[in-house]
């Protein structure tokens, strides 16, 4: 029993010294982050989205039907001030990975697309 109490005490002391939990892109209890809201100070402000496209593979070229099939990597980047924090407040944590489904994402599409999928 004394060993269990000592281990429990050590665990509690470690938890007390731990930094606060890292910031999260998930909505907090007070609803501070909403993935459906554009990260702009006002509704009239623009969100600058930088777009990069890298060719990964040339799959096929059908000259008769004028179809080119490729595989590409799409790189989108923008600044969302709602997801910033001071790393010193979180034990030096400078970044974290969050599922894209939990973040605001720009509405990007390909206009000249043969099969309608992008």
Curated annotation (Swiss-Prot):
Principal localization reads membrane
Query: Which UniProt keyword terms apply here?
Result: Cell membrane, Ion channel, Ion transport, Ligand-gated ion channel, Membrane, Postsynaptic cell membrane, Receptor, Signal, Synapse, Transmembrane, Transport
Compartments in which it is found? Postsynaptic cell membrane; Cell membrane
Q: One GO term of the cellular component aspect? A: postsynaptic membrane
- Report how it sits in the membrane: Multi-pass membrane protein
Pfam families hit by this protein: Neur_chan_LBD
* Region forming the signal peptide: 1-15
The reaction(s) annotated as catalysed by this protein in its Swiss-Prot or TrEMBL entry are: K(+)(in) = K(+)(out); Na(+)(in) = Na(+)(out)
What GO MF annotations does this protein's record show?
Answer: acetylcholine-gated monoatomic cation-selective channel activity; transmembrane signaling receptor activity
Which cysteines pair up through disulfides? They are none
What the entry lists under InterPro entries is as follows: Neur_chan_lig-bd, Neur_chan_lig-bd_sf, Neur_channel, Nicotinic_acetylcholine_rcpt
Query: What function is annotated for this protein?
Result: After binding acetylcholine, the AChR responds by an extensive change in conformation that affects all subunits and leads to opening of an ion-conducting channel across the plasma membrane.
Q: Which family does it belong to?
A: Belongs to the ligand-gated ion channel (TC 1.A.9) family. Acetylcholine receptor (TC 1.A.9.1) subfamily. Beta-1/CHRNB1 sub-subfamily.
Under the subunit heading, UniProt states: Pentamer of two alpha chains, and one each of the beta, delta, and gamma chains.
Name this polypeptide is given: Acetylcholine receptor subunit beta
The species this protein belongs to is: Gallus gallus
Q: Which gene encodes it?
A: CHRNB1
């Amino acid at each position: 029993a004394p060993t269990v109490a000592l281990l429990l005490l050590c665990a509690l002391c470690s938890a007390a010294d731990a930094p606060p939990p890292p910031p999260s892109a998930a909505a907090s209890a007070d609803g501070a982050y909403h993935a459906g809201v554009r990260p702009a100070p006002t509704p009239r402000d623009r969100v600058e989205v930088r777009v990069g496209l890298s060719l990964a593979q040339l799959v096929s070229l059908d000259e008769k039907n004028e179809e080119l099939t490729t595989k590409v990597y799409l790189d989108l980047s923008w600044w969302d001030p709602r997801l910033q924090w001071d790393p010193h407040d979180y034990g030096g944590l400078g970044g974290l990975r969050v599922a894209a489904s939990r973040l605001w994402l720009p509405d990007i599409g390909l206009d000249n697309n043969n099969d309608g999928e992008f």
